[in-house]
Amino acid sequence: MEDLLDLGEERRRCPATSGAKMGRRAQQESTQAENHLSGKNSSLTLTAEVPPPKPPRRQGRWAEASVKVSKSQRRASEEIQDHRLRQQSLDRSDDGGDIPVIPDLEEVQEEDFVLQVAAPPSIQVNRVMTYRDLDNDLMKYSAFQTLDGEIDLKLLTKVLAPEHEVREDDVSWDWDHLYTEVSSELLSEWDALQTEKEGPVGQPAHT
């Protein structure tokens, strides 16, 4: 009986001790797993927060030259803009300094435009010689009586008629008046012809 009781007690103790041992081991394993997981998580967070450094760009000489040219162009454009702004500011300051002065009405001299007469334009007009001037020159100067120094015009000048005989008066023509004049002249000519024809017929014959 006593042996049986001792075996039962040992069995009771063994599972308790084994359970205790199993619990400690499990706790250790769980803590190790947690530590491992936390280490992984921390490494992941570190890798996520701090990205790896980017590799340096490989730039050739053309890229460097283009960058330098662009920088120089920017500087030149900025200098030009600064120069323009300075000139504009100087011009504005100069314009602001010169204030136009408006004269008073008393200082302005009143001009009477009514009394002023415009001067006639001086235009040189070539004077046309009249027949009288030509006749006078032809009669006075003997040089005009010869043409080209060889042809003598004295016979022609002696036969020239005066101006009042050659020149006709300007008379306005009326159709009715012209018709009556022409018809009367024609009738008078016809009458003269008729009388000439009838004259020898009506005369008596001489024996």
Curated annotation (Swiss-Prot):
Residues where N-acetylmethionine is found: M1
Comp. bias intervals (Basic and acidic residues): 75-95
Biased composition (Polar residues): 28-46
Gene Ontology cellular-component terms listed: cilium; cytoplasm; cytoskeleton; intraciliary transport particle A
Pfam families named among the record's database cross-references: IFT43
Keyword flag RNA-binding: no
Single GO biological process annotation from the record: intraciliary retrograde transport
Keyword Transferase carried by entry: no
Modified residues (Phosphoserine): S77
Region (Disordered): 1-97
Keywords assigned by UniProt, alphabetized: Acetylation, Cell projection, Cilium biogenesis/degradation, Cytoplasm, Cytoskeleton, Phosphoprotein
Annotated compartments: Cytoplasm, Cytoskeleton; Cell projection, Cilium
Similarity field: Belongs to the IFT43 family.
Function statement: As a component of IFT complex A (IFT-A), a complex required for retrograde ciliary transport and entry into cilia of G protein-coupled receptors (GPCRs), it is involved in ciliogenesis. Involved in retrograde ciliary transport along microtubules from the ciliary tip to the base.
Subunit structure: Component of the IFT complex A (IFT-A) complex. IFT-A complex is divided into a core subcomplex composed of IFT122:IFT140:WDR19 which is associated with TULP3 and a peripheral subcomplex composed of IFT43:WDR35:TTC21B. Interacts directy with IFT122, WDR35 and TTC21B.
Entry protein name: Intraflagellar transport protein 43 homolog
Organism listed in the record: Bos taurus
